UniProtKB/Swiss-Prot annotation:
Pfam families: Mur_ligase, Mur_ligase_C, Mur_ligase_M. The keyword Cytoplasm applies. It comes from Streptococcus pneumoniae serotype 4 (strain ATCC BAA-334 / TIGR4). Cell wall formation. Phosphorylated by StkP in vitro. Dephosphorylated by PhpP in vitro. Belongs to the MurCDEF family. Pathway: Cell wall biogenesis; peptidoglycan biosynthesis. Its EC number is 6.3.2.8. GO terms for molecular function: ATP binding; UDP-N-acetylmuramate-L-alanine ligase activity. ATP binds at G110, A111, H112, G113, K114, T115, S116. It comes from the Bacteria. It is an enzyme of class 6 (ligase). This is UDP-N-acetylmuramate--L-alanine ligase.
Amino acid sequence: MSKTYHFIGIKGSGMSALALMLHQMGHKVQGSDVEKYYFTQRGLEQAGITILPFDEKNLDGDMEIIAGNAFRPDNNVEIAYADQNGISYKRYHEFLGSFMRDFVSMGVAGAHGKTSTTGMLSHVLSHITDTSFLIGDGTGRGSANAKYFVFESDEYERHFMPYHPEYSIITNIDFDHPDYFTSLEDVFNAFNDYAKQITKGLFVYGEDAELRKITSDAPIYYYGFEAEGNDFVASDLLRSITGSTFTVHFRGQNLGQFHIPTFGRHNIMNATAVIGLLYTAGFDLNLVREHLKTFAGVKRRFTEKIVNDTVIIDDFAHHPTEIIATLDAARQKYPSKEIVAVFQPHTFTRTIALLDDFAHALNQADAVYLAQIYGSAREVDHGDVKVEDLANKINKKHQVITVENVSPLLDHDNAVYVFMGAGDIQTYEYSFERLLSNLTSNVQ
C-alpha cells in the first residue's frame, strides 16, 4: 500500500520537485502553501497534486509529513499544531538523507551552478538508464524501478549534512548567504564536512582555490580548463551562437569532442564535471555525448522568450558570480546586440555584504535597470541599504524602475533584456511583456 505524503510549503523549489517525484513513484501526494502564485505550482497542478491553504485540518497522523525548512511554530499553523499534538514530521533534507540510501546516489553541490549541473546530469543519465532525480528548479521525476538517484545538494544552513552520496560534484565555493555563513572560511568548512561523506568519487572544479583545499575519503577528481593539475580538462573551445563545442581529456587520454546547446564558459565546466562523473561511474561516453547535445537547460536559468521580436532572458542569478556568468552567456549567443540587465537584489544582508561585487558584475552589461531590493522572510529591513546605494556604484547607463512603470526599458534598439533575481523579478518581466504587446497592438 502506497504512503500518503503531505508537504508543508509544497511550492518551494525543492519541495515541489520531491512531491512530483514521489507522485510519479505511485504515492499519494498533497501539500499546503500560501495562495500567491509561484512558478513551481504549474507542474504540481498538471500532475493533479492538491495544493491547500495552510490549515491544521490538513494534518493526519497516518501521513508522512515533510516540512519546508523555512517554516516554524511561530510562522506556520501546521507546524505549531504538529508540535502541540505530537505529530511527527521530517524536514526536506532529513527525508532526502534517508530516501537516497536505496539508490546509487549522485549529488551536485556548489555555491553557483548546481541547479544547471543537476539538470544536465539528470537529463543525460535518465536517457541512458532508469533514473529518479530532483532539480532545484522545481523539477522532479520518480521511477519505481530506478537504480540511480540524482539530486541537488544545498549548503544553506548545512542542509546537505544528512546526505551520503556515492558520487558528488562540487562546482565552486563562494561566500553567499551572509544571513547564515559568517565568512568564506565558514562556507569552506561546510563544504569540507560534506565532502567527507562522499563514498566513491568527488569531482571538483580544480581552478577554485578553496576547492583545492577540500579533503575526502573518496577519490577526488579535479576538472577545469588548465591541463596542469586537473584530471578532466576541457580544451579546443568553440563558442558560437548555437552553443559550445569542446574536447575533454582525462589524464592525457582524449575522450573526444562534445557539444552542448547552452552558453557561457560556466556551462562548459558543468558539462565537463558531468562527463567526468559518468565516465568514472562506467557509463558509455558515446551515449553521454549523444544526450548532452539535447540538454536544453533548466527553468529560470537563461530561459529565453521572444515577445514581438524582442529577446527576453529570465535567470535566477542573484549573486555577482552568477550575474557575470549569465551576461557572458548572453554575449556569446547575441554578440551583435546591446545587453540590458534588469536586476533585483535579493535580501538586504546579501546586498550589504556584496555591494561592490554586484556593481562590478552589473557593469559587464551595456545598460542596467534596478528593481527594489527583495527582502527575505528570514530578515527585517533596518534601512541599512537601499537599491540607490547600488545604483550609485554602477558606471554604465542605469536607472531604478518600478513594476508599475517599466517604460524606460524601451529606450534601446537591437537589445537583449536579461531579467535576473531570486525574488519577484518576473513581475517586472511580465509588466515589460505587456508593455511590448500593447505597443504592438496600438501600432496595428
